[in-house]
Regions:
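Gly/Ala-rich beta-loop-alpha elbow adjacent to hydrolase catalytic centers
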Residues: 144-148, 152
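Active-site signature of alpha/beta-hydrolase-fold catalytic machinery across serine-
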Residues: 154-158
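Short loop/turn segments at secondary-structure transitions that flank enzyme active sites
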Residues: 23, 69, 76-80, 176-179, ...
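The feature captures the conserved acid-bearing segment of alpha/beta-hydrolase catalytic domains
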Residues: 163-248
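Long, charge-rich alpha-helical interaction segments
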Residues: 246-248, 253-259
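A conserved cap/lid and substrate-binding interface adjacent to the catalytic center
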Residues: 37-143, 160-167, 190-192, 199, ...
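N-terminal low-complexity, Ser/Thr- and acidic-residue-enriched intrinsically disordered segments
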Residues: 1-66
Length: 259
């Protein structure tokens, strides 16, 4: 059971950080990047999104800090190769924590999670280990959307299961199922302060299918965007749709505004 409670204001703040991760990517990964909310950039996050063995690291998010508070923001899927990997549905043993099996595409993405655009740079979990080693970090929040939600989930269990930070807080939007029953149970025990915001119309939240052995982690926060946005698969999945459903002052994507 969660040790804390779901906070709309916290969800909205973290959602803005994930939107900033998208902006970082669409802007072409500029050398100068300032996180929102007065936070300072610690490092960007990169991952290899190519399945054929050819290195092609792209920026997926960032780690930011403000005093004792650290936020990790991870964007969702962009591009055909990422979508292909999203939906392989092949389970593999999760290599970083004894926690059952996870979907292969998500696991491969996570295995390439580094702080630079090649595999010689530190892994993201190791960067967090260094950041938290001095004992000055009091809160660690991890947030993601779509594929970024799966990656946030894997990062959180790696962090908690390997003694990097005992009690990360996780907010995900439009998360797919990440692993099997053993994984979900282990995750829920290690990372109880997790809130998985799920739009009832978003197909991604129903994948990979349970008949393939996949189980969602806790704790679901259901929302319904029926009266908010155009009724399309894309609009139901957009991060701005999620945030607008939580708070109507957040603008929808222009293509999703109802006529």
């Amino acid at each position: 059971m969660p040790l804390a409670t779901f906070s709309i204001s916290e969800a909205l703040q973290l959602g803005q950080f994930v939107l900033a991760a998208y902006d970082l990517f669409t802007a072409g990964d500029p050398a100068v990047f300032t996180p929102p909310g007065g936070y300072t950039l610690v490092t960007k996050i990169y991952a290899d999104d190519i399945t054929d063995g050819v290195p092609d690291y792209k920026v997926f998010g960032f780690i930011a800090r403000s005093g004792p508070d650290v936020i990790v923001a991870i964007r969702g899927t962009e591009g055909v190769f990422e979508w292909i990997m999203d939906f392989l549905f092949i389970p593999v043993l999760f290599p970083y924590v004894n926690a059952g099996r996870t979907e292969r595409g998500f696991t491969n993405f996570y295995s390439s999670f580094h702080t630079g655009a090649d595999s010689s740079t530190p892994r993201v979990v190791d960067a967090l280990r260094t950041l938290t080693a001095g004992g000055t970090v009091q809160t660690l929040e991890i947030a993601g959307h779509s594929l970024g939600s799966a990656l946030a989930t894997l990062l959180a269990i790696d962090v908690a299961g390997n003694g990097v930070f005992a009690s990360p807080t996780v907010y995900t939007f439009a998360s797919p199922r990440v692993g099997d029953k053993v994984f979900a149970g282990t995750y829920d025990g290690l990372v109880p302060n997790t809130w998985r915001v799920a739009n009832l119309n978003d197909i991604v939240t129903y994948l990979p299918p349970p008949f393939a052995g996949y189980v969602h982690v806790d704790s679901e926060v259901p929302i319904n965007s029926d009266d908010r946005t155009k009724h399309t698969i894309s609009c139901w999945h957009q991060l701005r749709t999620y945030l607008n459903t939580l708070d109507s002052s957040v603008a929808l994507d222009a293509d999703c505004v109802p006529a």
